């Protein structure tokens, strides 16, 4: 892998995925109770799903010809990983508004920016012919072909 010759879409997705991966181990929430303070990383609860989304987007950025944009199937997978991670981060942010908003830490905000970065990089730098419906159809076709191939003796 040569980072210099890597396609811009793949490069930005990979950078955002690595930033999100690192953010998962940084403090997300700082809890203070009777003078005792503790912090919690993102590797709890729904944060684990966000972690897998970052890994999935990073792996997809490495697959295939790295000098070209992602093909429809991989583009749709990267888009879905970014969208799912973004939705979970927004949900966690809304949930935190109930009381602990001031205690959110750098890891939470970095993970939110990284998930939005994956989503925006995948969508903004896509091929002009790529669409969400086309990506979903391509993914469905690939799954059907793999299923048919595994059923034949």
Identify the meaning behind each predicted range.
Residues 1-153:
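Compact integral membrane and secretory-pathway proteins
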């Amino acid at each position: 892998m040569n980072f210099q010759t890597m396609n811009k879409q793949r490069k930005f997705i990979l950078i955002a995925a690595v930033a999100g991966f690192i953010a998962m181990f940084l403090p997300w929430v700082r809890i203070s109770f009777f003078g005792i303070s503790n912090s919690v990383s993102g590797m709890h609860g729904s944060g684990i799903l966000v972690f897998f989304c970052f890994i999935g987007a990073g792996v997809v950025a490495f697959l295939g010809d790295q000098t070209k944009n992602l093909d429809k199937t991989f583009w749709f997978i990267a888009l879905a990983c970014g969208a799912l991670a973004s939705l979970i981060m927004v949900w966690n942010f809304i949930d935190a508004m109930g009381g602990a908003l001031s205690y959110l830490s750098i890891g939470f905000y970095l993970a939110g920016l990284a998930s939005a970065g994956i989503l925006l990089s995948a969508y903004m730098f896509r091929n002009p012919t790529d669409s969400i419906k086309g990506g979903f159809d391509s993914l469905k076709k690939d799954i059907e072909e793999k299923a048919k191939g595994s059923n034949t003796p």
